[in-house]
Curated annotation (Swiss-Prot):
It comes from Stutzerimonas stutzeri (strain A1501) (Pseudomonas stutzeri). Its EC number is 2.7.7.6. Keywords: DNA-directed RNA polymerase, Nucleotidyltransferase, Transcription, Transferase. It is an enzyme of class 2 (transferase). This is DNA-directed RNA polymerase subunit beta. Belongs to the RNA polymerase beta chain family. Pfam families: RNA_pol_Rpb2_1, RNA_pol_Rpb2_2, RNA_pol_Rpb2_3, RNA_pol_Rpb2_45, RNA_pol_Rpb2_6, RNA_pol_Rpb2_7. InterPro entries: DNA-dir_RNA_pol_bsu_ext_1_sf, DNA-dir_RNA_pol_bsu_external_1, DNA-dir_RNA_pol_su2, DNA-dir_RNAP_su2_dom, DNA-dir_RNAP_su2_hyb_sf, RNA_pol_bsu_bac, RNA_pol_bsu_CS, RNA_pol_bsu_protrusion.
Length: 1356
């Protein structure tokens, strides 16, 4: 395989055995594809597909006025250009969005003409607000913050059949129900009650008999019975009856008389139960009719009304029971035949017939009125109102929509073949659902599993945005309808009709404050990717935490390859928030699909298909690890999944095979090496804690990884990836300039790519985003190569933590209960030092008393406090500041107070103005120490710009100019290179001071200035033309870049759009360096977390026989009970990786030959299991580069479920000349004595989590108090106190510490007078206290009084 630029510099030894079938797809595709479909940005009018914005417009337009004389039609839309790019939006705190312009057509019809002749047509583009754009990394910038819209897993529209699991009725009887869920509109439920009648509910209101709905659909009683039942036909023959025989229907009944064939032979004796054998005999005997006594039909139900043949009088109504009287009438009236319903107790219950009997309505109108009364109780029903209401419920496209998904699911469930159809319900649909429900009650068919992923679908960003947009449009529609009637009379234009505010508001609300629009978790690249791939069952139209039961949260067999069974939060959201599996994607209906290889006759093919949970059920699917010989499945029985069960089958039966063992898990879980050896609960913690790792100062790749690290780093967007191949022209810390290869440059494009690197920027979680170049000048890069590392990446691989030398042993109780003992060397080498960036904001407002002013002239502040401020009152970049230091000086006007005569005199003499203003400067918060790394000033239009703002603006303009000049320099250089190759050797006609007939040489060209080249006149016309073209191209380019510069300059110089009343905003960015210290939380990747308890001097740490001390000591007791043995295997393999690195280091120091290096590398990569690496393709220099990068250890990849085996780990340890047990004798650093047994020592990848003691430590002496109770507030953010709670009070009571308790409950808490007195006393040096009445006691008394109880405290 060909290695990319970074891969060949550091090849990972890969232990995977299974063939590589398919690359992991682009990890952010779910977000980007969905939003791209929503916007359809590049599409022309004819290319628009019926999805996204286009579909939303088409569903609401055309809008027709109430009179029908005017209509507003939708023609198309276009998106403008964003005003600012992403970085500017973040800086200015605005939304990254584009204006949406919709072309609409207003048509006015002629009132007079009968056939609607068109009187007037006006077409116009209307502005419909701003639509947020997605950045290329799948996020949105809303008001300057990066947000992610999480996909939602909700119940798919369609029809679902279920039962109550016997919980409703005390008898435990199963009550079946059916529910039709539309995409939007009213829900329709059918349900059985304990007496087996069928009821209907609309939108969960009170229930009505189901027959009411059928009558409202204009079915008569006979039609209803006809639809649901077969009939038995009886012929009346004097005193007996003859039944038209259908033998199957007799099965299971008890014969009440002898059943004989035509010859008189008895087939079934009286009193015997009729069995399948009897039915066969009846079939053979060919009996068509069966004679029976009259009383056989008593109690049966009439299927069609029985009518007197002579008079036409109705003898028995349809759906009534036959009694002795009725039979007598039938005989008397000489009725020849009648029909009864065929029902029995086994598989054909009389449910619908019984329901009709309790139904009080008799015709359509009564049924409609009944439904109207249920939906609108208290309103008087009229025929029209009832009809309109019923029609609008399920049969009007604007109120009800099943959607394409819903229709497909509906038709599949009720057994139709076609998957397309109308979005509204029909009479037939409702009857079909009832039939299916009755069949299920009769024992035919099964209920649905609502947790099956075939019944839950994913709503992505695009779809949710479209829904919100439609909501906005519907609001607009109402307003437009009313204005349309005026449009004809007043000659209005479309612009005057449409008010875009509701649309803009709906979109803004969705992106800004929807439950699924979340502040992006930006701790590290993994947390970003995971957040974008998250699937939540919560949110609007989803579940709520409280109502979600155990079943919804549990892992379902259909999750396999679609949703990760491991990664989900702990706590109340467990199982409701999931993560997409590595290979999963959504199909056009929104169902999750997983890829499989097609297997035919036991042979695996190269064809890969994506299947949803519905399509997969009938397949027999082998695991990715099934043994293959070439392409044939070898084993006699293969472990497979079939019908959502795990079983074994013969190879011939297998139809599909997994593409990779890691398709089961999510990205985060697939980064845990030896995941297969960890308990699931700990793996869950491991995948969650990787997301909390803080990017360290120097990223360090994991020695033991899984091979997924490269994918995550590349797809997360934190690295700089080459857009086009080429040569590095120049590179420094802040940008990379690439001269693009000629064959990748489109005509008219610049042959240069400039990549500006992000330097020391704040992330959402206050961690530091910084990019470092990996390339050198002159390097050749291809498209897709990684050119610069971002936070937590090392040479294009994800690097969340550091490789630490660990020993598993107890050490003087310092690692009791998961504590961690660290070596001081870790601190000295800055292994876990992180940079955090805080943004502090100072806002200058216009107050009632006058504007606040940002200035260095602050009253009552000494010179020392101002020495870090410039003349504008803003701190210098680079200043080191500590708690309480002034960052931005600001004064606020103070209200005029009544002055005493003395003060007036003093002010008259000295002109003292200081008392007019108070100091409201921005100061560094307590407990924060750092360096100012950036200052931004935003000024409202019309306010004068101060010196600092002008300096910042000049600096930014210089940067932009430098970029554009660089771009022009390269374009110019490339153009002249092309000209040089064309001109050298050609003949000149003159110009530029040359004589006619001179042959151009390199020397001549070097002697001319570039501008002079264009003055050359050549003998060949083609060359002259080329010179002209080149000159025109360069002047165009220069013009283009100048325009670009002017545009940027204009943007910089225009005032900022600040909130009302705000004059100026100053943002100061502080970089805070945090070393690891006791109290910080650390973790491995296997859920093994702990808190640093102590940092020991290096000389006291345990060390091996060579004197190498360990970095970290972990407690071995943390492993067995937690069953995360993966960490031990990682430690062993890490030791081998490090040992091999040391051997390579030794070879390089001894300056061995390259051939020896090659041989050793070949042993490592190709002789101990796993994937073979093609080292022969590398040049000697590349082998040396590779070896240099392997000095600190050979990185290994052990993919999940396909990783290194025990024998391979041992072989690696042997190759590194280390003990195969992975254990060694350690010595106590303090005494030098050997420990009593050998210890497991190795290298583990440790993370520092974003739970730092600096953020949690907090102390208060005095501070703010709560308004009502007068007790101190709580929490660090409020600068609150520590709660002395109920149990703590008991403790002091138990000790009898009465005085301590008294001050806790009074002066230290809420005795207002007592605490002020106490403060005074302390100031005066008097340390006595008097306790008064706590304020909370007064609150209690007031509460009791509010209940109407008069309570008073009496003093004795």
């Amino acid at each position: 395989m060909a290695y990319s630029y970074t891969e060949k510099k550091r090849i990972r030894k890969d232990f995977s055995k299974l063939p590589h079938v398919m690359d992991v797809p682009y990890l952010l595709a779910i977000q980007l594809d969905s939003y791209r479909e929503f916007l359809q940005a590049g599409a022309t009018k004819d290319q628009f597909r019926d999805i996204g914005l286009h579909a939303a417009f088409k569903s609401v337009f055309p809008i027709i006025s109430y009179s029908g004389n005017a209509a507003l039609e939708y023609v198309g839309y276009r998106l403008g250009e964003p005003a600012f790019d992403v970085k500017e939006c973040v800086l200015r705190g605005v939304t990254f969005a584009v204006p949406l312009r919709v072309k609409v057509r207003l048509i006015i019809f002629d009132k007079e003409s009968s056939n609607k002749a068109i009187k007037d047509i006006k077409e116009q583009e209307v502005y419909m607000g701003e639509i947020p754009l997605m950045t290329e990394n799948g996020t949105f910038i809303i008001n300057g913050t990066e947000r992610v819209i999480v996909s939602q897993l909700h119940r798919s529209p369609g029809v679902f059949f279920d039962h109550d699991r016997g919980k409703t009725h005390s008898s435990g009887k199963l009550l079946y129900s059916a529910r039709i869920i539309p995409y939007r509109g009213s829900w329709l439920d059918f349900e059985f009650d304990p007496k087996d009648a069928v009821f209907v509910r609309i939108d969960r209101r009170r229930k009505l008999p189901a027959s009411v709905l059928l009558r409202a659909l204009n079915y008569s009683t006979e039609e209803i019975l006809d639809a649901f039942y077969d009939t038995n036909v009886f012929h009346v023959k004097g005193e007996t009856l003859a039944l038209e025989l259908v033998p199957q229907r007799l099965r299971g009944e008890i014969a009440t008389f002898d059943i004989k064939d035509d010859s008189g032979k008895v087939i079934v004796e009286q009193g015997r139960r009729i069995t399948a054998r009897h039915i066969n005999q009846l079939d053979k005997s060919g009996i068509k009719e069966l004679e029976m006594p009259m009383d056989y039909v008593l109690g049966r139900t009439v299927a069609k009304a029985i009518v007197h043949p002579a008079t036409g009088e109705i003898i028995a109504e349809c759906n009534t029971e036959l009694t002795v009287d009725v039979m007598a009438k039938i005989v008397k009236a000489q009725v020849v035949r009648f029909e009864t319903l065929y029902t029995n107790d086994i598989d054909c219950g009389p449910f619908i017939s019984d329901t009709l009997k309790i139904d009080s309505t008799t015709n359509q109108l009564e049924a409609l009125v009944e439904i109207y009364r249920m939906m609108r109780p208290g309103e008087p029903p009229t025929k029209d109102a009832a009809e309109t209401l019923f029609n609008n419920l399920f049969f009007a496209a604007e109120r009800y929509d099943l959607s394409a998904v819903g229709r497909m699911k509906f038709n599949r469930r009720i057994g139709r073949t076609e998957i397309e159809g109308s979005g509204v319900l029909s009479r037939e649909d409702i009857v079909a659902v009832l039939k299916t429900l009755v069949d299920i009650r009769n024992g035919k068919g099964i209920v649905d599993d609502i947790d099956h992923l075939g019944n839950r679908r994913v709503r992505c960003v695009g779809e949710m945005a479209e829904n919100q947009f439609r909501v906005g449009l519907v609001r607009v529609e109402r307003a437009v309808k009313e204005r349309l009637s005026m449009a004809e009379s007043e000659g209005l234009m479309p612009q005057d009709l449409i008010n875009a505010k509701p649309v803009a508001a709906a979109v803004k609300e969705f992106f800004g404050s929807s439950q699924l629009s979340q502040f992006m978790d930006q701790n590290n690249p993994l947390s970003e990717i995971t957040h974008k791939r998250r699937v939540s069952a919560l949110g609007p139209g989803g579940l709520t935490r409280e109502r979600a039961g155990f079943e919804v949260r549990d892992v379902h067999p259909t999750h396999y390859g679609r949703v990760c069974p491991i990664e989900t939060p702990e706590g109340p959201n467990i199982g409701l928030i999931n993560s997409l599996a590595a290979y999963a994607r959504t199909n056009q209906y929104g169902f999750l699909e997983s890829p499989y290889r097609v297997v035919k006759d036991g042979e695996v093919t190269d064809e890969i298909v994506f299947l949803s949970a519905i399509e997969e059920a009938d397949h027999v699917i082998a695991q990715a690890s099934a043994k293959l010989d070439g392409r044939k499945l070898v084993d006699e029985l293969v472990a497979v999944r079939h019908l959502n069960e795990f079983t074994v089958k013969a190879p011939e039966d297998v139809t599909l095979m997994d593409v990779s063992p890691k398709q089961v898990v999510s990205v985060a879980a697939s980064l845990i090496p030896f995941l297969e050896h960890d308990d699931a609960n700990r793996a869950l913690m491991g995948s969650n804690m990787q997301r909390q790792a803080v990017p360290t100062l120097r990223s360090d790749k994991p020695l033991v990884g899984t091979g997924m690290e490269r994918n995550v780093a590349r797809d997360s967007g934190v690295c700089v990836v080459a857009r086009r191949g080429g040569v590095i022209d120049s590179v420094d810390a802040s940008r990379i300039v690439v001269r693009v290869r000629d064959d990748e440059v489109e005509t008219g494009e610049a042959g240069v790519d400039i990549y500006n690197l992000t330097k020391y920027t704040r992330s959402n979680q206050n961690t530091c985003i910084n990019q470092r170049p990996l390339v050198r000048k002159g390097d050749v890069v291809a498209r897709g190569d990684i050119m610069a590392d971002g936070p937590s990446t090392d040479m294009g691989e994800l690097a969340l933590g550091q490789n630490m030398r660990v020993a598993f042993m107890p050490w003087n109780g310092y690692n009791f209960e998961d504590s961690i003992l660290l070596s001081e060397r870790v601190v000295q080498e800055d292994r876990f030092t992180t940079i955090h960036i805080q943004e502090l904001t100072c806002v200058s407002r216009d107050t009632k008393l006058g504007p606040e002013e940002i200035t260095a002239d602050i009253p009552n502040v000494g010179e020392a406090a101002l020495n870090k401020l410039d003349e504008a009152g803003i701190v210098y970049v680079g200043a080191e500041v500590g708690p309480g230091d002034i960052l931005v000086g600001k004064v606020t006007p103070k209200g005029e107070t009544q002055l005493t005569p003395e003060e007036k005199l003093l002010r008259a003499i000295f002109g003292e103005k200081a008392s007019d203003v108070k100091d409201t400067s921005l100061r560094v918060p307590t407990g924060t120490k750092g360096t100012v790394i950036d200052v931004q000033v935003f000024i409202r239009d019309g306010v004068e710009r101060d010196s600092r703002a002008l300096a910042i603006e000049k600096m930014q303009l210089d940067e932009i100019r430098k970029d554009l000049n660089e771009e022009f320099r390269i374009v110019e250089g490339a153009t002249f290179e092309r000209l040089r190759s064309a001109l050298v050797g050609a003949t000149a006609e003159g110009g530029a001071g040359l004589k006619k007939g001179v042959v151009i040489t390199d020397e001549i060209l070097d002697g001319l200035e570039h501008g002079q080249w264009f003055k050359l006149r050549m003998a060949e016309d083609a060359l002259n033309e080329q010179l002209e073209k080149a000159q025109a191209y360069l002047s165009d380019r220069r013009q283009l870049l100048d325009d670009k510069f002017e545009d940027k300059k204009r943007k910089l110089q225009q005032g900022d759009d600040l909130a009302p009343g705000v004059l100026k905003i100053v943002k100061v960015y502080l970089a805070i360096k945090r070393r690891i210290q006791p109290g910080d939380k650390m973790a491995g990747r296997h859920g093994n977390k702990g808190v640093v308890s102590v940092i020991m001097p290096v000389e006291d740490m345990p060390h091996d026989a060579n004197g190498t001390p360990v970095d970290i000591v972990l407690n071995p007791l943390g492993v067995p009970s937690r069953m995360n043995v993966g960490q031990i295997l990682e430690t062993h393999l890490g030791l081998a990786a490090k040992g091999l690195g040391e051997k390579i280091n030794l070879m390089l120091e001894e300056q061995r030959k390259v051939a020896e290096l090659r041989k050793f590398l070949h042993e490592i990569y190709n002789e101990i299991g796993g994937r073979q690496e093609n080292l022969d393709d590398l040049s000697d220099q590349e082998v040396l580069d590779l070896a240099n990068n392997l000095r600190k250890g050979v990185p290994m990849a052990t993919p999940v479920f396909d990783g290194a085996k025990e024998r391979e780990i041992k072989a690696m340890l042997k190759l590194a000349d280390l003990p195969e047990s992975g254990q060694m004798q350690l010595f106590d650093g303090r005494t030098g004595n050997a420990f009593e047994r050998t210890t497991t020592v190795g290298y583990m990848y440790m993370l520092k989590l974003n739970h730092l003691v600096d953020d949690k430590m907090h102390a208060r002496s005095t501070g703010s108090y709560s308004l009502v109770t007068q007790q101190p507030l709580g929490g660090k953010a409020q600068f609150g106190g520590q709660r002395f709670g109920e149990m703590e009070v008991w403790a002091l009571e138990a000790y009898g510490a009465a005085y301590t308790l008294q001050e806790m409950l009074t002066v230290k808490s809420d005795d207002v007078n007592g605490r002020t007195k106490m403060y005074k006393n302390i100031v005066d040096g008097d340390h006595r206290m008097e306790a008064g009445m706590p304020e909370s006691f007064n609150v209690l008394i007031k509460e009791i009084r509010s209940l109407g109880i008069d309570i008073d405290l009496e003093t004795e």
